Amino acid sequence: LEKIEFIIPCYNNKYQLKNILYSLLNQSNPNWTAHVISDGEWVEYDDFKIDFERENLFEDKIKFSLIKGPNKDWGHTARNYGLEHATQDWVVMTGSDNYYMPDFVSEFLKNTTNNNFIFCNMVHNEAHYKHYQELKAELTVNNIDMSCFATKKENAQQLRLNKKSYQADWEFVEKYITLFPGGIKHINKILYVHN
């Protein structure tokens, strides 16, 4: 069975990190793993990791790593590290401030046949919005978020995120679909929330 690996950079945000991990633990399909990469040491990281492991909530689904940092590059160094060490068939490079609907993994894995890039719609919440806003994802600049798509691991590992660019999401997508055309599937459902 195919699995999705969530690559989750984090730094100094244990409450948000708990939210994304619980959203994964509540997936209706168990065929996923997560790799949490701390972008440098922070005061509560070790305690958070120990407490989470002690609770034994994840049954070997969640791995923790610490890299030298903070790199202050929107998590791109940590995502590149996670990508280099990915072990599952599919990867989702996300952020610790996000969370997923319970059927995200199920919907994505139903659509893997003959596809190598799968993406869904999302809800977006930023400080300047007064409310959550639905965004129908499109393969154009400013209309797709790193966390709403999954790619075949072996293809994604041939690319890297631009550490200096705020638009690394789109730059990655543009390179990916240019190098690996075809096999693109849009799931016209909201399965992801960017907080």
Please describe what each predicted stretch is.
Residues 3-5, 23, 33, 171:
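Cell-envelope/extracellular polymer assembly enzymes that use nucleotide-activated donors
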Residues 13-26:
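Short, well-formed alpha-helical segments that are part of the catalytic scaffolds
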Residues 25-68:
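Acidic donor-binding segment of Leloir-type glycosyltransferases
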Residues 69-86:
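Glycine-rich, basic loop-to-helix element that forms the pyrophosphate-binding segment
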Residues 91:
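Short aromatic/hydrophobic "clamp" motif used to bind/position activated sugar donors
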Residues 105-131:
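Conserved donor NDP-sugar-binding/catalytic core segment of glycosyltransferases
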Residues 137-195:
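Conserved nucleotide-sugar donor-binding catalytic segment
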